[in-house]
Amino acid sequence: ISFVSMEGAQKNLEHDIPDWDFNKVSVCTRKMWNDALSKIKIEGNESDKTTFYTALYHTMIDPRCFSDIDGKYIGADNKVYQTSTFTYRTIFSGWDVFRSQFPLQTIINPDLVNDEINSLIQIAEKSGKGYYPRWEFLYAYSGCMVGNPAVSVLTDAYQKGIQNYPVDKSIQYAINTVRTFGNNEDGYDPGDLSKTLEYAYSDWCVGTLLRSQNR
């Protein structure tokens, strides 16, 4: 599979399944998942373990890889780009995951979090919007749910030392995001109370980022 080209799909296939051996692919896949899931070890009966590791597996499905093995990906302006510094990812269901899945990933899979922040920065930049998507799908701004969850993900990662991305640019896009969707000078949203609460939290996140840089 490639979102870029047939040639990209061929390269991905040759990299992922060079031998075209079903049994070998099965063994390798099982090992990869066992390695990923073994980052957390628990004690308990088999039923409890099945429930826990099934849930842990679910946290590792998205955001999924959107770039080819050679680093090429389709940007938010529908042009092809290439990177060697991160894996471009998609399906950021921000409001669903910023309180739970992403704080967990900062502990067990910080590289994934770093990938996602780089991807969000690229979307804000290549789209020309200059702010983060709330719920991203195939580099599109769906606008689903409320608040500014990407700002929270960025703040949590930055405070934990996950910073392998253009920090100044990431913070500027965070500022733009809360200015575009936020309480701003009024200090509240005239709509639902839940919006005021979410926006107040993202304002605090931006303030935390700026204080971390003595700004």
Predicted regions and their residues:
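Alpha-helical support elements that line or immediately flank enzyme active sites
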Residues: 52-67, 90-113, 152-161, 204-215
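Acidic/polar, glycine-enriched structural segments that form the non-catalytic walls/loops
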Residues: 1-88, 122, 129-130, 168
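A generic structural signal for ordered alpha-helices
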Residues: 11, 78-82, 91-94, 98, ...
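Solvent-exposed, acidic/flexible segments
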Residues: 22, 26, 30, 45-49, ...
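Glycine-rich, histidine-containing beta strand-loop boundary motifs that form or position
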Residues: 1, 70, 104, 116-117
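Second-shell loop/turn segments in exported
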Residues: 15-22, 37-45, 88-90, 101-106, ...
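Active-site cavity-forming subdomains of large catalytic enzyme subunits
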Residues: 112-120, 124-215
